């Protein structure tokens, strides 16, 4: 995310989202009644040719809308914000509806009452654009699962079988193994960033040696770590371990996974945790909340009702962390009602 300009007296921040992660961050920052300004396409009628049955022509115009609906479309790499027009050229009626498609590299101005957690999230998005992206390959001698680590979740890219079998002789297995390595490399060769190989056994070390010999250009980006499991279980193990943070700086998904692990640990021992809206509100009555945890879905559904609680946590120097439901940690928080808190001290 690039922050272009801040205009505090108007509560406006001009910014440019650079990738899908930035669009996801914006989807959690923009809320109903915020004003959004951007260059967009608008279909207008040709006044001189009213007999034509077409829908007019599209042209690029600078519009402002008051947001009503905010929809993040991962598959289409865009964020759609719909609402009534509040600023437009003279020939476009104020109050009519429009949808602005926010895509990477489109400059957008957001006008809102900026909260601390909004600004923290914006800073995280700005910092994350400077960090290396990470692909995780969880493998053993028989199968490799390749994942892309994003700010808001994990994308499973491909699963590759090795073809190695006890039914084959040594030479055939060696050929199958090198073909396996080649398929893995082909799947990640165009990726610009760090590549983490992890899993049980020596498969991760063997492919590292193969890369050092055959693909020297990739070798500097390769990191190898141990994991006890393969597949998604191995990936979950890696996310909980903090290894991603050592490579990435502090990956948001890793941070979210670790904080939910801490929450579940505290719940299991009836320690410094509260979950469910009643329990969390009770903790706030004692000013006991250190970190308020909300799923993005819960926040979108209840933002107007929950914002007072978020402000109260901020006023006692607590933290507010919004957890994505696109990964397992977010799903675990969702199962707890979508809202929980880590506490400063125990309460009855």
From Swiss-Prot:
Task: Provide any one GO MF term from the record.
Answer: metal ion binding
Which superkingdom heads the taxonomic lineage of this protein's source? Answer: Archaea
Q: List the disulfide bonds.
A: none
Please give the chief subcellular localization of this protein: cytoplasm
Instruction: State any GO CC term.
Output: cytoplasm
Keyword Endoplasmic reticulum tagged? no
Q: Cite the HAMAP family for this sequence.
A: PelO (MF_01853)
Q: What is known of its domains?
A: The N-terminal domain has the RNA-binding Sm fold. It harbors the endoribonuclease activity.
Job of this protein: May function in recognizing stalled ribosomes, interact with stem-loop structures in stalled mRNA molecules, and effect endonucleolytic cleavage of the mRNA. May play a role in the release non-functional ribosomes and degradation of damaged mRNAs. Has endoribonuclease activity.
What does the annotation say about its assembly with partners? Monomer.
What is the protein name given in its UniProt record? Protein pelota homolog
């Amino acid at each position: 995310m690039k922050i272009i300009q801040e205009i505090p007296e108007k509560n406006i921040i001009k910014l440019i989202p650079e990738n899908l992660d930035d669009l996801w961050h914006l989807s959690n920052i923009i809320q109903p009644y915020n004003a959004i300004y951007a260059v967009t396409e608008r279909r207008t009628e040709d006044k001189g040719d009213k007999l034509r049955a077409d829908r007019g022509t599209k042209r690029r115009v600078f519009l402002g809308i008051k947001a009503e609906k905010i929809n993040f479309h991962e598959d289409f790499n865009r964020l759609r914000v719909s609402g009534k027009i509040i600023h437009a050229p003279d020939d476009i009626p104020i109050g009519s509806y429009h949808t602005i498609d926010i895509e990477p590299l489109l400059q957008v101005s957001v006008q809102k009452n900026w909260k601390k957690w909004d600004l923290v999230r914006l800073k995280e998005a700005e910092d994350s654009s400077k960090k290396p992206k990470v692909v995780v390959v969880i493998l053993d001698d028989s199968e490799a699962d390749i994942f892309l680590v994003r700010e808001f979740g994990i994308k499973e890219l491909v699963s590759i079988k090795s073809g190695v079998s006890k039914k084959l002789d040594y030479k055939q297995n060696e050929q199958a193994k090198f073909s396996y390595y080649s398929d893995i490399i082909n799947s990640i060769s165009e990726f610009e960033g760090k590549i983490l190989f992890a899993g049980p056994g020596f498969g991760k070390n063997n492919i590292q040696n193969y890369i050092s010999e055959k693909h020297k250009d990739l070798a500097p980006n390769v990191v190898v770590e141990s994991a006890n499991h393969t597949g998604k279980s191995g990936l979950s193990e890696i996310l909980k371990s903090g290894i991603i943070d050592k490579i990435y700086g502090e990956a948001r998904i890793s941070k979210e996974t670790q904080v939910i692990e801490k929450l579940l640990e505290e719940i299991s021992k009836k320690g410094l945790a509260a979950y469910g809206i009643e329990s969390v509100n009770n903790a706030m009555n004692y000013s006991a909340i250190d970190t308020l945890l909300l799923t993005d879905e819960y926040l979108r559904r209840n933002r107007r009702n929950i914002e007072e609680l978020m402000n109260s946590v901020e006023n006692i120097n607590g933290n507010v962390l919004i957890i994505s439901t696109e990964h397992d940690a977010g799903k675990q928080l969702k199962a707890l009602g979508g809202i929980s808190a880590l506490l400063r001290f125990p309460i009855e």
